[in-house]
């Protein structure tokens, strides 16, 4: 029996977010109002008004998550009651392990799956799982190599299946639905895995046990953390992402309850409801939905099924992009997909929480052009003399408050680890963890404004016909040539130099306040090259800076 009160929780959370938003807006007004408000400052206030809901939501999720992480003996169970009711052991139901592949290196894909199948067999649960390799590979030569690799892999494994489509209609969502329509038989659940996903047998068995404990669960999405990375870029990025997702997902799960997220992989899904309710038709403009996962989640919610998040990171991993160019391309794909949600907001048959989820996904990327506009308007205002009466201390306080809220997920995750010694111990102790946190903060302070500018440029180009496909991802860790970095990032560099010079002509104080947001743009090319440099990667690994528990466990 649970005592969740969705209305009360959401009202309390809404009040917290509103209070944070009002504080941010008051601090901004307090900084800009003295001496009169110029036209540029009015536009800045408008942009701040639009980005503040996301910043306040981030801070609210982080504070609630941190409170649960510090105050509960079992944080995942505190926000997912079915976890406490789950029966450990061999499951009753048959579950498909559905791995979506397209033009992948099977020598990288298959070994983690072999370990998973072997460990499930060792737990005497092997006959309860069926591995399905769902291929959308179109290239004939790659398909032949793929089929040969799977055939060798399947020798001696009776529970391995392989299916390749000749037409990849509907992309990944269509791949999964084709499996459910034409190939699934007695499987009650399926666990979605990407080609770079890694899950342990313990994590898989826990997901099935949770689903069996609550027959109204449609999806349970587990937290996903980065696989141990060699390259500096993913190593630093995912160290902070891991800390941030821990607090964010815990806080969000507390108030979203049965209206949780689905991120497309490392999740368990009940087959029949998904097949009935999560089928995706074309958008009103005729295009296919790119970011399918959130839409599938809100469809199940609208049909009365529970979608929950399991904010536990153990045994659920993925590979992050190996370098800055791949990361930016992935962001562009996600941004293009999330912007499609504008068309879905007008459609009927979504719950209020479902629409809120879609709106959050839009705000995640819509904030980029708004933050870029704030920086550009601030430079124009400073050069034109509009900021002459602005008290710098008040402005610095407002900027710092927004910075705290923007980065609050990872900051609260860092606080959790440093305050709880047993968490920091998994990273080598508090000192080792603090070194990783400081390195990540320094790197991301340079990279985040650059990433924001890149998203802003991409989103601004979407109405003019720019498109991004869902091409196979480069997962190989490699260096970046200076020429390649310059060709990709010269616009970002020029914008950064122009903004920095603009603030420098006003005053040293203006330059000092702007540098945290422009320096990464100025250094875009070397930052891209250095973060992929094998020498820097080796230096970080040798000193175990930003090492994860999985890396330390195998070293």
Label each region the model flagged:
Residues 80-103, 434-447, 480-485, 529-555:
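Cytosolic juxtamembrane regulatory segments of multi-pass membrane proteins
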């Amino acid at each position: 029996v649970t005592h969740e009160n969705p209305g009360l929780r959401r009202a309390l959370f809404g009040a917290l977010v509103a209070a944070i938003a009002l504080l941010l807006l008051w601090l901004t007004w307090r900084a800009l109002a003295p001496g009169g408000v110029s036209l540029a400052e009015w536009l800045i206030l408008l942009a701040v008004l639009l980005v503040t809901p996301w910043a306040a939501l981030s801070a609210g999720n982080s504070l609630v998550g941190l409170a649960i992480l510090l105050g509960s003996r079992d944080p995942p169970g505190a926000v997912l009651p079915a976890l406490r009711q789950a029966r450990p052991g061999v499951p009753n139901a048959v579950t498909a392990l559905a791995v979506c592949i397209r033009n992948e290196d099977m020598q990288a894909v298959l070994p983690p799956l072999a370990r998973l199948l072997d460990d499930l067999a060792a737990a005497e649960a092997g006959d309860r799982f069926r591995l399905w390799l769902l291929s959308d590979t179109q290239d004939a030569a790659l398909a032949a190599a793929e089929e040969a690799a799977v055939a060798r892999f399947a020798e001696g494994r009776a529970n391995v299946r392989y299916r390749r489509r000749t037409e990849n209609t509907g992309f990944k969502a269509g791949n999964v639905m084709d499996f459910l329509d034409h190939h699934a038989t007695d499987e009650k659940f399926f666990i979605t895995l990407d080609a770079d996903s890694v899950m342990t047998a313990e994590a898989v068995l826990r997901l099935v046990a949770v689903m069996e404990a609550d027959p109204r669960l449609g999806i349970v999405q587990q937290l996903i953390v980065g696989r141990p990375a060699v390259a500096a870029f993913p190593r630093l990025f995912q160290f902070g992402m891991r800390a941030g997702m821990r607090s964010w997902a815990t806080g969000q799960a507390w108030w979203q309850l049965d209206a949780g997220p689905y991120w497309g992989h490392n999740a368990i899904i009940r087959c029949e409801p998904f097949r009935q309710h999560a089928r995706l038709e074309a958008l009103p403009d005729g295009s296919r939905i790119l970011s399918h996962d959130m839409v599938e989640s809100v469809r199940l919610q609208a049909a009365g099924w529970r979608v929950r998040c399991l904010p536990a990171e153990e045994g659920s991993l993925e590979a992050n992009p190996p370098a800055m160019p791949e990361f930016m391309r992935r962001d562009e794909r996600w941004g293009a997909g999330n912007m499609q949600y504008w068309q879905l907001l007008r459609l009927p048959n979504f719950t209020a929480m479902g629409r809120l989820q879609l709106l959050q996904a839009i705000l995640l990327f819509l904030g980029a052009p708004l933050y870029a506009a704030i920086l550009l308007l601030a430079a124009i205002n400073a050069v034109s003399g509009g900021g002459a009466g602005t008290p710098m201390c008040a402005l610095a306080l407002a900027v710092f408050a927004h910075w705290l809220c923007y980065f609050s997920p990872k900051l609260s995750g860092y606080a959790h680890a440093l305050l709880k010694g047993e968490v920091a111990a998994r990273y080598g102790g508090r000192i080792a963890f603090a070194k990783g946190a400081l390195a990540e903060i320094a790197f991301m302070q340079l990279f985040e404004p650059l990433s924001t500018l890149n998203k802003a440029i991409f989103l601004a180009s979407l109405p003019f016909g720019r498109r991004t496909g869902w091409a196979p991802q480069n997962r190989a860790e490699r260096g970046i040539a200076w020429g390649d970095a310059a060709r990709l990032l010269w616009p970002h560099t020029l914008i950064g130099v122009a903004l920095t010079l603009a603030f420098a002509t006003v005053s040293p104080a203006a330059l000092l306040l702007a540098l945290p947001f422009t320096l990464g743009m100025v250094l875009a090319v070397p930052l891209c090259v250095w973060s992929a440099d094998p020498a820097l990667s080796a230096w970080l690994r040798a000193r175990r800076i930003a090492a994860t528990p999985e890396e330390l466990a195998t070293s």
